[in-house]
Regions:
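Glycine-rich phosphate/diphosphate-binding loop of Rossmann-like nucleotide-binding domains
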Residues: 1-10, 22
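Glycine-rich phosphate/nucleotide-binding loop
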Residues: 13-105, 109-117
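Glycine-rich phosphate/pyrophosphate-binding loop and the adjoining helix
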Residues: 100, 109-147
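Hydrophobic alpha-helical scaffolding
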Residues: 4, 25-26, 79-80, 99, ...
C-alpha cells in the first residue's frame, strides 16, 4: 500500500507515537529525505548513531546519516566524531550482502557498548572518548561475545 503525503504533515505524524508505526518506507527527494531521516534518527539516539542505506535495483550504498562531520574537523575535534552511525550502516551492509551472523554480532556489540555497559562515552569533545577508542571497545566486545 502506498500513500502520498506532504512533507510538513509527514514530519508532524512521525513524532506522533500513535501514527509513527504506520511508516515503513519513505521514497523522497534528497532534501526531504535528509529532513525525515534526521528527525527519525532522534528516536534511536540521534544522527550521530543512525546508519543509512540507499538500496536500488542494482546498487546499494551505506553511510553515516550525519555525513563526514566537517564542522568537527574545522574545529579540531575530528578524533572525537561518533563512529556509531557508520558502524550501524556497516550492520546494514553486512546484512544486505548476506553476512547476517557478522551483522548480528556487530549490532549486539553496539547495543552492549552504547546502551548497556557504557564504559566509554562519546561526547564529541575532549571530555569523551575518541572515535578510535570507541571502535576498539566495540571490537573487544565482539571478540568477548563470540568466544
Amino acid at each position: 500500500v502506498t500513500d502520498d503525503w506532504y512533507v510538513d504533515i509527514t514530519t508532524a505524524k512521525l513524532i506522533d507515537p500513535a501514527r509513527r508505526k504506520d511508516f515503513k518506507v519513505f521514497v523522497l527527494p534528497n532534501l526531504y529525505g535528509d529532513i525525515i531521516t534526521d528527525e527519525a534518527a532522534e528516536f534511536q539516539g540521534g544522527v550521530g548513531t543512525a546508519g543509512s542505506a540507499n538500496i536500488g535495483k542494482k546498487y546499494a550504498m551505506f553511510e553515516a546519516v550525519h555525513g563526514s562531520a566537517p564542522r568537527m574537523i574545522k574545529e579540531g575535534r575530528g578524533q572525537y566524531a561518533d563512529p556509531c552511525s557508520m558502524l550501524r550502516a556497516s550492520v546494514m551492509l553486512l546484512s544486505h550482502i548476506g553476512f547476517q551472523k557478522q551483522a548480528n554480532a556487530l549490532e549486539a556489540a553496539l547495543d552492549k557498548c552504547m546502551l548497556e555497559e557504557k564504559k566509554l562515552v562519546i561526547t564529541g569533545r575532549a571530555d569523551g572518548c575518541t572515535c578510535s577508542e570507541f571502535g576498539d571497545y566495540v571490537m573487544e566486545t565482539i571478540t568477548q561475545m563470540t568466544k
